[in-house]
Curated annotation (Swiss-Prot):
It is found in: Cytoplasm. This is Global transcriptional regulator CodY. One of its GO terms (cellular component) is cytoplasm. It comes from Listeria welshimeri serovar 6b (strain ATCC 35897 / DSM 20650 / CCUG 15529 / CIP 8149 / NCTC 11857 / SLCC 5334 / V8). Its main location: cytoplasm. InterPro entries: CodY, GAF-like_dom_sf, GTP_trans_reg_CodY_C, Transc_reg_CodY_N, WH-like_DNA-bd_sf, WH_DNA-bd_sf. The lineage of its organism: Bacteria, Bacillati, Bacillota, Bacilli, Bacillales.
Amino acid sequence: MTLLEKTRKINAMLQNAAGKTVNFKEMADTLTDVIEANTYIVSRKGKLLGYSESLPIENDRMKQMLTERQFPEEYTQSLFNVGETSSNLEVSSQYTAFPIENSDLFTKGLTTIVPIVGGGERLGTLILSRLESNFTDDDLLLAEYGGTVVGMEILHEKAEEIEEEARSRAVVQMAISSLSYSELEAIEHIFDELNGKEGLLVASKIADRVGITRSVIVNALRKLESAGVIDSRSLGMKGTFIRVLNDKFLVELEKLKNN
């Protein structure tokens, strides 16, 4: 492939990702294909977002890292010291992508570190590695362009997460506001009793202890269930099993209790 063809292939990653869930594995595959190197896309917290290997490394520690999809904290933190692309780092470098315990097997191993930056902040790191042949200026151009595309997708994913969080919080607030005073009181007692995200509720016991009717409890649970905030399942004489579906619910409920 020519440099132009390789650039177009990276550009296609951005076009294909439009409106879809970000697939960092496919992005890593593309970068491995055009740069001809092992590719690791690592978040700022060391999570392995996606990777592709043209040369699999037979090392138990590396295999475990790939399985757990998590890079060591010390290594991840050290990457923040790399503020711009650092290329052709030898196996003796602290930033090497090759296992240092097997450095004698990878004496010709070379690593390139590309910071992923977007919106004025460090979003992660693109790590490339291969044996023998140096990363050329063309390779570095492709790597930095690839890092920019990955950064745009990380920002897009973060924006979607923020939007989803806001939507979840709004649903919870609407559901809680639909409750009457007595229903809200009943819900507070129910989740004090559960002391967690799920558990078994005996409505009659709570009704007797708090001094409210069982129908108030039933109505409150129905409102929350219809809003998709909780799921409830009758177990007959044993009671009702309740599970919280919206993670923001308990947070908002706690805020109300503290106000």
